[in-house]
Regions:
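C-terminal motif of bacterial Sec signal peptides marking the signal peptidase cleavage site
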Residues: 18-19
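A short, acidic, amphipathic alpha-helical segment used as a generic capping/interface helix at domain edges
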Residues: 323-330
Length: 411
C-alpha cells in the first residue's frame, strides 16, 4: 500500500499548476439560504458537495459546497467547548451549551465547529460507561442548535492520543484494522452519526483536529517521548483512519453531508516526511500530491487551518497568503474536492489584522471559513468572549463579511 501511494504521489506531484476560478453558479446569500433551508421540511439536510462541470479548453471541473440546492458561501466560527465542556464530574450539564448557542444566534453566527467528544483519555468513560445519556445530550445540543438556526460541524476525535491511551495501545493503532483504537473509531462514529443525522443543524462531519501534524515526524522519538516505533505515526495510518471514518459516515448518513478531515495546513515538508523522512521543503506539485493522501475519498473537502500569512514552496520560495490560497484551492480542485478553511487567525493585535484574512478568503472565493474561537467564559486558549472588545468586533466582522458574501452571490 505504501508503494502504491508513493507511486501515485509521484504522478500527482508533476501536474502543472494553474489558477483557480470562482464558481460560475450564482449562489444565494447566507440569509436567503438559511430562510430557504430552515423553513423547508423536505429539504436535504446539511451542507453537501456537488461537482460543477468544466467549460472551456483545459478547464478543471469544480467541487462546490451547497445548501438547500444553492451554492453556499459563509464565514462562521468555533465553539470548541460547546459539548465537551459540559461533561462534568461524571455527569452532563448543558446549561453552558444552550447559553453559548443563544449568544451565537444573537450575534448572527450561522455555522459553528465544535469538539464532539473529549480531549483527555480519562474523559472517555463519559461515553463508554454512559453511552445512552451521552448520545441523548448530543441530540439535545443538535436540537437546540436547530431551534437557533445554527449549523454545526461536529469534530469527532479532537486529540489524536486520547483513544489510544485509553486502550493502552500505540498511536499507530489508528491505522491497524482490528485494534481497539479502530474499534472505538468505528463504534463511536456509527453511534454519533446515527444519533445526529436527523437534525438539520448538522451541516457536516469531521474526523478530528490536525492529525496530519502527527504524521511521519523525523523527530518522532522526541515528539512522542518514546523509542518504540509502534508510536511513530505514519501518513498511511492516518489515511486508513480517515477512510474508515468517512466510509462509515457515508453509509450511515442518507443526506450525504460533506465530510472533512480537520487537517491543519499541511507542513511545508509534509510530502518529504512521508516519502523520505526528511524536513526538506515540498514544491507545489508535491504539496498537491500529499494533499490527496490526507484527504482520501469519500472525504470530499480539503481542510486547512490558516494561521500564517503565507508559506514556503521549494519551487517558488515564500509566497503570500493570496498565493497560498490559490495553490490550496487548485490542489482541492484537482481532487474534485471543495476547499475549507477550518480554523484561522487566533489572537491578532487589531481588527485590521483580521480583515487581511477575511479579505484574502473573500478574494480567493473560499466558500467556508471558520474563525477560532468563541468561548462563553473565555476558558479555551486563544479565545474571545462576547463582552470583551475583541469579541465584539470579531462578531461584527462575521456579520459584515457574510453580508459581503451575500452581495457577491447576488442575493
Amino acid at each position: 500500500m505504501k508503494r502504491f501511494f508513493r507511486s501515485a504521489l509521484l504522478l500527482l506531484s508533476v501536474l502543472s499548476t494553474a489558477g483557480c476560478n470562482r464558481p460560475s453558479d450564482k449562489g444565494a446569500g447566507i440569509s436567503d439560504l438559511q430562510t430557504r433551508y430552515w423553513n423547508n421540511e423536505s429539504v436535504r439536510k446539511g451542507l453537501y458537495v456537488k461537482n460543477v462541470p468544466a467549460t472551456g479548453v483545459n478547464a478543471v471541473s469544480e467541487a462546490v459546497i451547497c445548501l438547500a440546492g444553492w451554492v453556499y458561501h459563509a464565514t462562521g466560527g468555533h465553539c470548541y467547548g460547546l459539548f465537551s465542556y459540559c461533561l462534568k464530574d461524571g455527569g452532563i450539564d448543558l446549561t453552558d451549551a444552550y447559553a453559548s448557542l443563544d449568544i451565537l444566534k444573537e450575534q448572527g453566527v450561522g455555522v459553528v465547529r465544535f469538539n464532539c467528544g473529549v480531549f483527555y483519555s480519562e474523559e472517555l468513560p463519559a461515553y463508554t460507561d454512559h453511552r445512552d445519556d451521552y448520545l441523548a445530550a448530543l441530540r439535545k445540543v443538535a436540537a437546540y442548535a436547530q431551534q437557533c438556526e445554527i449549523g454545526l460541524i461536529p469534530s469527532f476525535f479532537w486529540n489524536y492520543s486520547a483513544v489510544s491511551l485509553y486502550y493502552g495501545e500505540p498511536y499507530r493503532c489508528w491505522g491497524k484494522a482490528g485494534s481497539r483504537t479502530v474499534g472505538f473509531l468505528m463504534r463511536y462514529t456509527e453511534d454519533v452519526v446515527t444519533a445526529l443525522r436527523e437534525y438539520k443543524s448538522i451541516f457536516g462531519w469531521e474526523f478530528g483536529n490536525e492529525l496530519n501534524l502527527q504524521a511521519d515526524l523525523p523527530n518522532w522519538q522526541e515528539r512522542f517521548d518514546t523509542e518504540d516505533p509502534a508510536n511513530w505515526t505514519k501518513g498511511d495510518d492516518i489515511h486508513f483512519a480517515f477512510r474508515t471514518f468517512a466510509d462509515i459516515v457515508r453509509a450511515k448518513d442518507p443526506d450525504s453531508r460533506m465530510i472533512l478531515s480537520g487537517n491543519a495546513t499541511l507542513r511545508p515538508s509534509q510530502y518529504h516526511q512521508y516519502v523520505e523522512n526528511s524536513w526538506d521543503t515540498d514544491d507545489t506539485g508535491q504539496y498537491r500530491a500529499i494533499t490527496n493522501l490526507f484527504n482520501p475519498y469519500p472525504i470530499n473537502t480539503v481542510t486547512e487551518h490558516v494561521y500564517e500569512t503565507g508559506r514556503k514552496f521549494s519551487d517558488c520560495g515564500k509566497v503570500s497568503l493570496d498565493r497560498q490560497l490559490r495553490e490550496a484551492m487548485y490542489a482541492a480542485r484537482t481532487l474534485n474536492k471543495a476547499y475549507v478553511v477550518g480554523e484561522f487567525a487566533g489572537v491578532l493585535q487589531s481588527e485590521e489584522a483580521y480583515r487581511k484574512y477575511y479579505d484574502a478568503f473573500l478574494d480567493a472565493g473560499v466558500q467556508l471559513t471558520l474563525l477560532w474561537n468563541f468561548a462563553l467564559r473565555g476558558d479555551v486558549e486563544h479565545s474571545f468572549t462576547a463582552t470583551e472588545p475583541r469579541g465584539q468586533y470579531l462578531f461584527g466582522l462575521i456579520r459584515e463579511y457574510n453580508e459581503k458574501y451575500a452581495r457577491e452571490t447576488g442575493k
